[in-house]
Amino acid sequence: MNAIECKQVSVWYDDVCALDAVSLTVPEGDFLGIIGPNGGGKSTLLKTLLGLLEPASGSIAIFGKKPAEASRLIGYVPQFSRFDRRFPASVMDVALMGRLPARLTAFFSYSRHDRQYVETLLEQLEIADLKDRQIGRLSGGQLQRVLIARALAAEPRLLLLDEPTASVDTRSKEQIYQLLKELNRHLTVVIVTHDVGVISSHIRTVACLNQQLHYHGEPELTGGLVEQVFGCPVDLLAHGAPHRVLKEHGEGIA
């Protein structure tokens, strides 16, 4: 079964086109990286998959269901820079939010199973020792793991992440990608990223998005294609190391 099927999906913000006739199929078990310039529609695509935005035209199926019907099958990790660290909550409090039901009752409380499940997740993500720490006292990498734990607490089949390694140090970035690679053993993973340097070493397939879908396939991109999508030479994106986009030096770069 396919985890995601988008057919000719277009999304508009008033008179501005964010997505233009995007068709994309993601098989279950894939690890897809979506790259593209700022304003290219990457976050808009995630929001549309989540059912937060309604496409102006086209159709979307998540495991064969409409996004609104598949919400419990999806875990979402937003950019942590948009997460208010002043929120008075502990690591455990935030992770437990993933166990909240679709409809809350006045007397809702987490079950023992909920707490045990989340504690196990925190152990697997190597942040169990931080469970009582306030989120305002976490590093960027630690907070990102907490947000991943919250998403996994819902027991999803599809994990969507919006730039999970933005503003984290190099060591934390590598740890997060290794974690996602491990999670991909039993989850479909879709990640939005500007980090073209990780495309070849961590993900299975890549989608280049700039309002339209320019490429979807193996993570071996030519410099010309990336320049077409981003509108600038590939060496500007990879900080002087254009061959980091590919598996081996010289493959596909003229």
Where are these regions (language model features)?
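ABC ATPase nucleotide-binding domains
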Residues: T222-A254
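Conserved ABC transporter NBD signature motif
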Residues: G58-I74
